[in-house]
């Protein structure tokens, strides 16, 4: 008999405002403890020195974390000109120091070269894996691993501030884009070097910024609930966004009880409103006007033109 997981089944997505100096995994484990959740997973690590939006998927919501990994993101970054570091951020060792003599025109021209779709070689100080190990582990041992340049897209790049040796940017990018690499490349293009002084992720996909919450706020809610002898879940769970928020924008199809049961057992079905191809959100309900329609997971259109299960929600009542 399989060992039962410790914790409760709580499902959803928490928009954590990750603090400076904390690893994404440490933040994840803290949220998991506060919620006493059986399962938890984040949707793309933020560097310890970075702050901002870190969606934490709980319970069955972890099945859909990959879709948030694949979505675009927005950052506010402050680049320090004149100093290049090993890690391209403030935590690395200084590689070079140069005098900053950059005009507004030079900066504008350099920034324009990053807009649109370009190639980027991932930083050695990244979580990308090579032979099962993250690149940053090789980097710490002084080992340089060959990396292929990848297509990235900078949808929007706005200059917020330029004061001598500091450049503040708002940047909206595709998945897999490394901001520290953009800043390092910018410094090389300007001929003076640069590194990330401050980095904040302000958006992941279409998630609302106002729904973010900090760890101290969560801890305070838990402490107050215990002091008032209130079940913590009564105050914590309303902070969660629904699981289907992770696949917002994906085409929706609708099935009846029998078809839902078939999907839960791994079988493809015919669905209402299904497209000819691609991934789909699957709901137990009549159609898009059914206010009680229940999200049961993500499927895809197979070669037979049926909706096949890909990530199906399994709740305790089933």
Curated annotation (Swiss-Prot):
EC primary class: isomerase
SUPFAM superfamilies (UniProt xref): Pseudouridine synthase, PUA domain-like
Annotated EC: 5.4.99.25
Any single biological process term in GO: mRNA pseudouridine synthesis
Single Gene Ontology MF annotation: RNA binding
UniProt key word Transcription regulation: no
Keyword Transmembrane: no
Transmembrane parts of this sequence: none
Active site: 47
UniProt keywords, alphabetically: Isomerase, tRNA processing
Catalytic activity: uridine(55) in tRNA = pseudouridine(55) in tRNA
Name of one Pfam family that matches: TruB_C_2
Signal peptide stretch: none
Annotated function: Responsible for synthesis of pseudouridine from uracil-55 in the psi GC loop of transfer RNAs.
Family as reported in the entry's similarity comment: Belongs to the pseudouridine synthase TruB family. Type 1 subfamily.
NCBIfam families: TruB
Protein's recorded name: tRNA pseudouridine synthase B
Annotated organism of origin: Colwellia psychrerythraea (strain 34H / ATCC BAA-681) (Vibrio psychroerythus)
Lineage of the species this protein comes from: Bacteria, Pseudomonadati, Pseudomonadota, Gammaproteobacteria, Alteromonadales
Gene that this sequence comes from: truB
């Amino acid at each position: 008999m399989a060992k039962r997981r410790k914790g409760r089944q709580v499902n959803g997505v928490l928009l954590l405002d990750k603090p400076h100096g904390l690893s994404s995994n440490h933040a994840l484990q803290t949220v998991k403890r506060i919620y006493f959740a059986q399962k938890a997973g984040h949707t793309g690590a933020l560097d310890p020195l970075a702050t901002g939006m870190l969606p934490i998927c709980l319970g069955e919501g972890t099945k859909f974390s990959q879709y948030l990994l694949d979505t675009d993101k927005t950052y506010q970054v402050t680049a320090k000109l004149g100093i290049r570091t090993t890690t391209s951020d403030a935590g690395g060792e200084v590689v070079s120091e140069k005098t900053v003599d950059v005009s507004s025109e030079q900066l504008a021209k350099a920034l324009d070269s990053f807009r649109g779709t370009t190639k980027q070689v991932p930083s050695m100080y990244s979580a990308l894996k090579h032979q099962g190990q993250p690149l940053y582990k090789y980097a710490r041992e002084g080992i340089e691993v060959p990396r292929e340049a990848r297509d990235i897209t900078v949808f929007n790049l706005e200059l917020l501030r330029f004061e001598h040796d500091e450049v503040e940017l708002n940047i909206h990018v595709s998945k897999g884009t490394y901001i520290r690499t953009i800043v390092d490349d910018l410094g090389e293009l300007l001929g003076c070097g640069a590194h990330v002084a401050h980095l904040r992720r302000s958006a992941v996909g279409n998630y609302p910024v106002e729904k973010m919450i900090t760890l101290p706020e969560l801890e305070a809610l838990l402490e107050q609930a215990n002091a008032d002898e209130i079940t913590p879940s009564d105050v914590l769970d309303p902070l969660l966004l629904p699981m289907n928020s992770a696949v917002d924008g994906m085409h929706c199809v609708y099935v009846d009880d029998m078809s839902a049961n078939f999907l839960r057992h791994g079988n493809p079905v015919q669905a209402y409103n299904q497209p000819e191809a691609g991934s789909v959100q699957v709901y137990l309900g009549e159609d898009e006007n059914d206010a009680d329609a229940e999200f049961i997971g993500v499927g895809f259109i197979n070669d037979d033109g049926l909706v096949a299960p890909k990530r199906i929600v399994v709740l305790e009542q089933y």
